[in-house]
């Protein structure tokens, strides 16, 4: 009887909408702005707890890295570049037990349904490369954004999904017209 009541209490379902059991008990966003000087939670996918975890791992003195590329490489979010005879062999990222990289990958994986430029970027990569590689590439992009925000005290400017899609469309049209011109053709816009 005692065991049954203990099990009932232990495995009782939480009420829906009760929030996360790991929710912070203080206003972390305002403390993050005070500590870092910028609002890191403005980046899609980055919550206050994620930003705290990343800041606690990397610190606020980013002068250890000369560039955002070195920072991303330290996190283990850059692909390897093995080359033999001019041919690229493999592109796996190095395995790392870095908690900041894990937090960035989790943040990137939450962007699949986000209606932001980063969400559209993630979905485009996911359809082309697959989920694991898309998560790593998007985490790399978020890491570079965070590095630039903290080091240069720049606020994140969300341009939105539509801006990203229009920019991608313009880039496709430019590339198609260049290829057509090289083949001796000309692209013309038609009205529908």
Residue ranges and their predicted role:
Residues 1-192:
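A detector of single, family-specific signature residues
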């Amino acid at each position: 009887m005692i065991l049954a009541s203990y099990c009932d209490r232990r495995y009782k379902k939480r009420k829906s909408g009760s929030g996360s059991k790991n929710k912070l008990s203080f206003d972390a966003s305002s403390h993050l702005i005070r500590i870092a000087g910028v609002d890191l939670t403005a980046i899609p996918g980055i919550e206050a707890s994620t930003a705290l975890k990343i800041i606690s791992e990397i610190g606020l003195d980013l002068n250890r890295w000369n560039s955002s590329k070195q920072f991303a490489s330290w996190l283990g979010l850059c692909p390897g570049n093995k080359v033999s005879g001019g041919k690229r062999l493999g592109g796996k990222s190095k395995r790392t037990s870095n908690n900041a990289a894990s937090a960035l990958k989790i943040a990137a994986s939450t962007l699949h349904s986000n209606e932001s430029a980063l969400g559209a970027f993630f979905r485009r990569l996911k359809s082309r490369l697959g989920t694991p590689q898309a998560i790593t590439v998007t985490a790399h992009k978020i890491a570079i954004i965070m590095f630039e925000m903290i080091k240069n005290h720049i606020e994140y400017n969300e341009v939105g999904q539509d801006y990203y899609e229009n920019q991608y469309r313009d880039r496709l049209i430019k590339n198609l017209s260049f290829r057509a011109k090289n083949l001796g053709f000309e692209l013309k816009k038609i009205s529908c």
